[in-house]
């Protein structure tokens, strides 16, 4: 299966395998969440600066939904991008994808 993946993705998976961590399905929920946070921080590098980061909550059909708004440097109006990453709707969260979202905000 991995032979069908791009060389970059294969290298990423090999780096994760080399750490010798147990498979995510063998971890408790809390362990899986911590591993995801550590892994994304390690692979993502330092977060890039943006003009403003705001954490807000909006009402959803099953309760409040956390959102993070990234405002890039420069004059408005700015483009809008909505980034959904469910992480299986269990493991990942706003912090695990902060580096990615900051990079998207700066380059959009």
Language-model features: locations:
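Short beta->alpha connector loops of Rossmann-like oxidoreductase domains
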Residues: 90-91
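Short clusters of hydrophobic/aromatic residues that line enzyme substrate/ligand-binding pockets
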Residues: 58, 78, 94
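Short amphipathic alpha-helix adjacent to the substrate-entry channel of hydrolases
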Residues: 95-108
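A glycine/proline-hinged amphipathic helix-loop "lid/cap" segment
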Residues: 1-69
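Short glycine/proline-enriched loop/turn "hinge" motifs that connect secondary-structure elements
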Residues: 73-75, 105-106
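A generic beta-sheet turn/junction motif
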Residues: 60-62, 73, 84
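Short beta-strand element of the alpha/beta-hydrolase
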Residues: 67, 77-87
